[in-house]
Curated annotation (Swiss-Prot):
Binding partners and assembly: The complex is composed of an ATP-binding protein (RbsA), two transmembrane proteins (RbsC) and a solute-binding protein (RbsB).
Binding site for ATP: 54-61
EC number: 7.5.2.7
Topology in the lipid bilayer: Peripheral membrane protein
Domain ABC transporter intervals: 22-258, 263-512
Designated gene of the protein: rbsA2
UniProt cross-references to Pfam families, sorted A to Z: ABC_tran
A GO cellular component annotation in the UniProt record: plasma membrane
Domain of life from the UniProt record: Bacteria
UniProtKB keywords: ATP-binding, Cell inner membrane, Cell membrane, Membrane, Nucleotide-binding, Plasmid, Repeat, Sugar transport, Translocase, Transport
Listed CDD domains: ABC_Carb_Monos_I, ABC_Carb_Monos_II
Taxonomic source organism: Rhizobium johnstonii (strain DSM 114642 / LMG 32736 / 3841)
Record localization: Cell inner membrane
Name of the protein described by the UniProt record: Ribose import ATP-binding protein RbsA 2
Catalytic activity: D-ribose(out) + ATP + H2O = D-ribose(in) + ADP + phosphate + H(+)
Amino acid sequence: MMNAAFQQTATDSKTGDAPAILEMRGISQIFPGVKALDNVSIALHPGTVTALIGENGAGKSTLVKILTGIYRPNEGEILVDGQPVTFASAQAAIDAGVTAIHQETVLFDELTVAENIFLGHAPRTRLRTIDWQAMNSRAKALLTALESNIDPTIRLKDFSIAQRHLVAIARALSIEARIVIMDEPTAALSRKEIDDLFRIVRGLKEKGKAILFISHKFDEVYEIADDFVVFRDGRAVGQGRLKETPQDEIVRMMVGRDVENAFPKVDVAFGGPVLEIRNYSHRTEFRDISFTLRQGEILGIYGLIGAGRSELSQSLFGITRPLSGKMMLEGREITIHSPQDAIRAGIVYVPEERGRHGLALPMPIFQNMTLPSLTRTSRRGFLRAAEEFALARKYAERLDLRAAALSVPVGTLSGGNQQKVVIGKWLATAPKVIILDEPTKGIDIGSKAAVHGFISELAAEGLSIIMVSSELPEIIGMSDRVLVMKEGLAAGIFERAELSPEALVRAATGNA
């Protein structure tokens, strides 16, 4: 259904009988050169999970920033319990009962669990000092309600992503949030961790919370959400009940077309060996790994969480050092002690957590894209802005980067466009080997097909690619061969003709 019909019914056709907790009516957000949101109306109801679906750049992130008080819309109004409100700051949104749990949780490693939960609203004694005993006790009660035995007095620095999400949810409960926004919460979770998260979400529903669930994973959307809203090009183009709407229809709403070939793999005539790894071992994470990567080949690496896939990739890039083993690049033995060594050798790495490890978020797009290539854009120690812009523009156009300008901070981009910046900055160095760690994590279905197509193009041009992925369709659809890892060991290398979900899962789990 199209936007006009949706706008008329968005606030009164939702599933629940209860009035909406929060409504957005006619919201528009305008930035220089782009209308990020165009006359958007949505309603969130108590005890209901509403999935917000759309391609990267569709306006989802802008909507979340408005709801959390980071942006103030140019047009439209927000109502809470039927009363107009203005979120002039993040604190104003929190005071109104709105909280967000992001894909990369905003928590502080050096603070304890309890301190993170009650940051900014810690219980006080009569003397107005922090009541540490009460804070730890309340944090423990919140965690127990979430069926967690996490010690609230320990620091967060060694916590897994799943544990961080749990702390973020406990924080939401501590401020008595009524509207909970979950932005790609399952992106780095195992299936068991996803099941645990969904159990908590269902508990929040029972407590009457209104939940806005943002995800690109349709199986999870259909599992946990009741309703959906689809964004495209800054507009809300469709809404309804998930159980009444086929997935293909939602995809058509998202992209305005049918997406037929999600894995546009190109057959490539491989060249000779480019990277050879022999008996590579790490002190704790992986042991005795060997493989050969040929020119133009896409080598997939698959395994369960904790199998050592990312750790192996990071070691190849020099983030960590191997305990033993040999690395050969184009027939010559090399030693990689640091990422700088790897870059000089022609090996680059696109990390899983792009926001934390791949980008300088406050810096402009063009500077992020040219950081590893400063020797090409400087003369006698002085940077040449025109050359920086020209280099950044070249790869921005090649990757179809969607941004108002190359001078805007990269942190203002959607997740998919941020990923394009990371890939572009490494392509600008003319590498021989590129390692892609979860390259489509947090990317929508339409953009995934585009990224897959670009990966295939790079392979056809002779670039050698290592692709780490936890998504079986991606591994099978894009790889020429697959190295399966299990508990730090190589469980097998499969040729393309041998690839099947059953074979890879059996190898990854040890159930031969």
